[in-house]
């Protein structure tokens, strides 16, 4: 939270100070009002006696706090002053309360704003393994629900953390000052009240943790089923998935019911003990003071206002206890949420290397003794002993069975994963000594999953230019020309120009209104528009027909002749004309040579090629 406070400007810092101050001022007024009301009631019940004293010239004296008295010249003056005082105090209390709520709202709202901004920035910068560890659904809950709980806690802290204890302490002090005999009842019931509240709050912490886990689980369930809707439909898994959701929903319902039940028990228990306090107080007063009577005798009329004031302060005490209990409940929930937020914020970020005056490097790529793995210890070094070199300006292919580690290599090249051991060199220089921004601009990668952003085709293709300093101040006409050139390279112009609004055609979230092949071509155009020196195509033309794929490869070869091109595919026909082909099997290099030589030396390559040929692959077509 200290990091959030540093982001506050003068206005928010002022609100941070004013919120508890005005809350405290409101509490003082709330505590004084019952005493003025008790004095006003005393005037009403003792009006005959007071008028007699006024007529005799003794003046009018009315009981106030702690046996003090308010003196007036006449009964009428007492009535006017007391009534006016109560009205003015109530108005001031209202104004102070509104100001404190307004200030607390400003601070709480900005706390959630800065927290969300900080968490989102962290999500954008954490390492890929950390992102994989959480998953998008869990990160979404922490960015929204957990931050909202922190917003509530901030508001409660500024309002209730001041209001609750002072209402309790102030109410207790004024109750004792009003009627010490009746206050003995508080010593009997309050220990029991505190004991019950303490037990309930202790039980609430694990219940809220389980509830948050249930929220994560049901979000994961929904995200999986919604994103995999077509699979569910095609395999007729609707009933199966509904049963899984029913189980997750039942767990969430059970945890929510338990946590809500336990954390709302404090309210009825508190009111029960409050009622017991009043009953015990009345019994004590009747036992200790035999002069108390419920009759209109003037001598006993003064006790009635004190009983009224005591009951009012008892209400404040109860209110303070309830607010304290609710604050503790929210604190418990927010503490769990804060722990989950800190867990994300403490995750390591992708290391950025800043190298002033970065020299231009040749687009060669070399792996030396690289090992990497994800998940548990058994998979820690799934990729092992990767030693290879891609020369600048040439085309290379990476092929292998499903799950062999091809995409892991692509992610390592793209800088998403750092190897567990070994070194990577670009242009003969270790990537640890290369400026990170320079390296990111140097390497362009088109992933298997082509994620497009909501907007237009133009905004998606030109997104690669947004972070390029050399393009920031270029006119739109030049950017449009680069966009159309990139679309032509990716053969995306053929379908884009069929739209009535061409490049301004709307792209829905994740590109849902485009076909798989259209999304792949837009993704390729988005990458080649930046003219990367090293281009990685990770199975990114799988949805294209053979002729379109051939045309895209030719365009890339002709338009980016100096670029080192790395094509990852399961289809050997897509990469067999590369200068060299690297065969990956179970995370290791099984072969690295030309197509012709691999047919003589690599059994896995031969088997894959024969299997694809048996399935109808055309290996005689000209690439």
Swiss-Prot record:
It is found in: Cell membrane. The keyword Nucleotide-binding applies. Residues 365-611 form the ABC transporter domain. CDD domains: ABC_6TM_Tm287_like (cd18548). Disulfide bonds: none annotated. ATP binds at residues 400-407. One of its GO terms (cellular component) is plasma membrane. The chain crosses the membrane at residues 27-47, 86-106, 157-177, 180-200, 266-286, 307-327. SUPFAM superfamilies: ABC transporter transmembrane region, P-loop containing nucleoside triphosphate hydrolases. Signal peptide: none annotated. Coiled coil: none annotated. It comes from the Bacteria. It holds the Pfam family ABC_tran. The keyword Ribosomal protein does not apply. Its main location: membrane. Keywords: ATP-binding, Cell membrane, Membrane, Nucleotide-binding, Transmembrane, Transmembrane helix, Transport. InterPro entries: AAA+_ATPase (IPR003593), ABC1_TM_dom (IPR011527), ABC1_TM_sf (IPR036640), ABC_transporter-like_ATP-bd (IPR003439), ABC_transporter-like_CS (IPR017871), P-loop_NTPase (IPR027417), Type_1_exporter (IPR039421). It is a multi-pass membrane protein. PROSITE patterns: ABC_TM1F (PS50929), ABC_TRANSPORTER_1 (PS00211), ABC_TRANSPORTER_2 (PS50893). One of its GO terms (molecular function) is ABC-type oligopeptide transporter activity. SMART domains: AAA (SM00382). Residues 16-325 form the ABC transmembrane type-1 domain. Belongs to the ABC transporter superfamily. This is Putative ABC transporter ATP-binding protein MG014 homolog. It comes from Mycoplasma pneumoniae (strain ATCC 29342 / M129 / Subtype 1) (Mycoplasmoides pneumoniae).
